A protein has these predicted regions:
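Hydrophobic transmembrane-helix bundles of small-molecule transporters
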Residues: 127-210
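Transmembrane-helix bundle of Major Facilitator Superfamily
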Residues: 1-152
Length: 210
């Protein structure tokens, strides 16, 4: 983050939104994933989610300003949010019962290795090349995932009635409440928690919306 802030001429507070914007968008989309799958099918949601994640990874790498970076990160988080719950659903639905424990174990190991190695790899890329390569690095595995989805998951019909019957008011208040809660959790420590009027107001918004 310091290298990105310096390159884009952002303050510390502005730079913190690079992470916050991603997490806010992601936490809104995760609970909506099941509803999206029931309307559009797992295959379509995975393809759109992965494609959008890759496109906005490129947008992040090309961002000329901190505003563009924050917007691209938010959209990257929104598209990437479907990938977390659908990873578990794929293991549960596509693997035979006898192989599901192995699938869960491999997923957990891969996730832990990625989280442990990510900062080191990102730091090395930043030192040797540029912070922009952190986002380029996500493209090859994303393309491999798209190929695997297209090859292995069967197409299914679209059920648009599920969208018409959706509780749009509930979705809006849930999105507002979850985003406010995530902002409180991310920004609270930097703003001295409830000594900050912004954190107090955002906490009230989260409580009333949820």
């Amino acid at each position: 983050l310091p290298d990105i802030r310096g390159s884009l001429g952002a303050t510390f507070e502005e730079g913190s939104w690079i992470t916050t914007a991603y997490l806010v968008a992601e936490i809104i989309v995760i609970p909506l994933t099941g509803w999206l799958v029931s309307a559009f099918s797992m295959r379509r949601v995975l393809i759109v989610g992965t494609t959008g994640f890759l496109l906005f990874s490129v947008a992040c790498s090309l961002a000329p300003t901190i505003g563009a970076m924050i917007a691209a990160r938010a959209l990257q988080g929104a598209f990437g949010g479907v990938l977390i719950p659908l990873s578990f659903q794929l293991i549960a639905t596509e693997l035979p019962l006898s192989r599901r424990p192995l699938g869960m174990a491999l997923f957990a190991v891969a996730n832990n290795v990625a989280q442990a190695a990510g900062p080191s790899i990102g730091g090395w890329l930043t030192d040797v090349y540029s912070w922009r390569w952190i986002f380029y690095l996500q493209i090859p595995p994303g393309l491999a995932l798209l190929a695997a989805i297209a090859r292995s998951i069967r197409p299914q019909a679209v059920h648009a009635a599920g969208l018409r019957n959706g509780d749009w008011g509930g979705i809006a208040t849930m999105a507002l409440g979850l985003s406010a809660m995530q902002i409180v959790l991310e920004e609270g420590g930097r703003r001295d928690w409830f000594a900050s009027p912004f954190i107090v107001q955002t906490s009230i918004l989260a409580a009333t919306s949820l």
